[in-house]
Amino acid sequence: YFAQHAGEWDTIRSMQVAEEEVERAILGLMKNRRPGHLLDVGTGTGRMAAVLGAGASRITALDRSPEMLRIARTRLAGSPVPVELMQGDFAALPLGANSVDSIVMHQVLHYASAPDLVIAEAARVLRGGGHLLIVDFAPHDREELRRDAAHARLGFSDGQMRGWFAASGIILESTEALSGGALTVKLWLGRRR
């Protein structure tokens, strides 16, 4: 899907706040938290791994698409920390239990038909005390994103996230909303018990 529809990203991006503002908010939330071994789920071009990776001890960048992993490989080639690129699915992460310190899912969860299971799978690989950061959309009614951009979900509420986090043993520590267009970007940061 992503290789065939790359041109549509500009349309989606125009519906939300500038990505630079999202990145500033992400860095602000993670400012006092050491990423350790960082897992970037749905790495795409590797941008989030690059943004958060400077403070990491190691980066695992995971994506289903071999084409996206090739792009990420180029972007992350000069990383100051070891990077492993891995093909895999967010519903069945190819990592052992308690194996990573931080996980970021940036604009990924809305592709999940069962987001609760994706969060539970993230919790499985996250070490106790580790952080899960999900960046996605608040609830919206842009049905064309289902049709044109393969979104399985039209955003998430704080209540949904709080429930899914709690069911997976993750304490929701912080939420942030960034408005600036038809879509509101939300950041949910949790810590595994």
Segments (PLM) and residue ranges:
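Conserved catalytic loop of SAM-dependent methyltransferase domains
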Residues: 4, 13, 17-19, 23, ...
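Conserved alpha-helix/loop element of class I SAM-dependent methyltransferases that forms part
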Residues: 16-37
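A short glycine-rich, Lys/Arg-flanked "PGG" loop and its adjoining helix->strand segment in the class I
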Residues: 116-131
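N-terminal, positively charged/glycine-rich alpha-helical extensions of SAM-dependent methyltransferases
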Residues: 1-7
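Class I SAM-dependent methyltransferase SAM/SAH-binding core
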Residues: 37-92
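C-terminal alpha-helical "lid/dimerization" subdomain adjacent to the S-adenosyl-L-methionine
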Residues: 131-188
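A short acidic, Gly/Pro-enriched loop at the edge of an enzyme's catalytic core
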Residues: 91-103
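A short SAM/SAH-binding and catalytic strip from SAM-dependent methyltransferases
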Residues: 101-114
